[in-house]
Amino acid sequence: MQQFELTHEFLSQLEELIDAGNKTEVSKQIAGLHPADIAEILEELNNERAQFVFLSLDNEKAGDVLAEIDEEERVHFIESFPAETIARRFIDNMDSDDAADLVASMPNEQQHEVLSHMEDLEQAGDIVDLLHYDEDTAGGLMAKELVMVNENWTVLTCLREVSRQAENLDEIYNIYVVDDDNKLKGRLSLKKIITAPTSAKISNLYYPDIISVKTDEPAESVALIMQKYDLVAIPVIDQVGRLVGRITIDDVVDFIREEADKDYQMMSGISQDVESSDSIWAQTKARLPWLIIALFGGMVSAWMISRYEAEIALFPVTAMFIPVITAMGGNVGIQSSAIVVKGLASNSLSLKHGFQNIVKEIGGALINATICSSIIFLLTLCFGMQTLAMPITVTLSLFVVILFASIFGTAFPLLLNRMKIDPALATGPFITLTNDIIGLNIYLITGRLILTGLG
């Protein structure tokens, strides 16, 4: 299958066919396209045209396409469909994890109505079961579809069961072996059962060493485990060890992307998860808290400057370097905190090595502070200062501010992480605001001491 590229010409041609009501030609245009490509097309169409395309798909492909549509768009898209259509045309043909995510996005009343119209009662039961788990746990990520065989079966029985169970799966990553109580015992490869005698017992063939996670395992931990052991799928067990589902790499990738989006927004000073398609009020609510905090922080900085009004009036050139000091402090702090937050998120930085990281950061900060301070010293000399008081003030202040910002930007995320608070809060507006206030204090106090003494 060739990679599809959505062009303006293709979209215009498709819209003309839709407006003409030519369902046959529309079906030909999208035939053979991957569900993700069709989802991309639907997101570019208005709701009426998207529905026309969607209803031209067969039930199985419609379910696959719906799973690929962005969550926010998907919620708006299905609002116009009756509960019976959602249940029988879409949810009955989706994987249990995708179906559960879709149902979870509906109001409670609509959830009950949709589930009551489902023809696949086993699928309905799986969805209800999955809805009980927190979305940020292994239980919330897992799907119920898997291939499971009993350790007491023969290879012949196993082959028959694998063939039957595989009908509900797109890919078979592993065959899981359980005992009579459905407790996970190990895994079995397809090669093993194909090459083994049909009369052989599964108990003599399976691999007992298998990595699994419990339903309440945090999703972030699941992602780290799968990354560490290079897994494409991992079984999920309940508290007593019974096999209840499996998580595949695509589910983990989706979770990682969502978490990265949240962290990026938090680092940008957006307190809630918002999309460009959200209402103006929703976007305002997400941005306003940090803007108000930044406003009050700016007022604190203004008040601090007013306290040194006499010194600034006596040495007006002092005001010229305030933006340099605050900008450098903010930039250095963000750089340091971003490195720490990245390390904590990828589990490559532990609290045990936190002190070592601070020491390393101090070393780097000393080098950066020395270089930047030397540059600013030479630049201030170019302004033709009559004395060395101002160059020394700016140079010394910048050196101390860079050193402090580096240490603070490194230590604060580690402290938040130890307090079980998302360290992403430590980056962006908070670091900038804190370093602005403290950096100004350092600069103005240094100026008062040096300028009044040497000026």
Regions found by a protein language model. Give the residues of each.
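Hydrophobic packing positions in regular secondary-structure scaffolds
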Residues: 1-270
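Active-site His/Glu-centered metal-binding helix of metallohydrolases
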Residues: 437-438
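Alpha-helical transmembrane segments and their membrane-interface boundaries
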Residues: 262-425, 429-433, 442-455
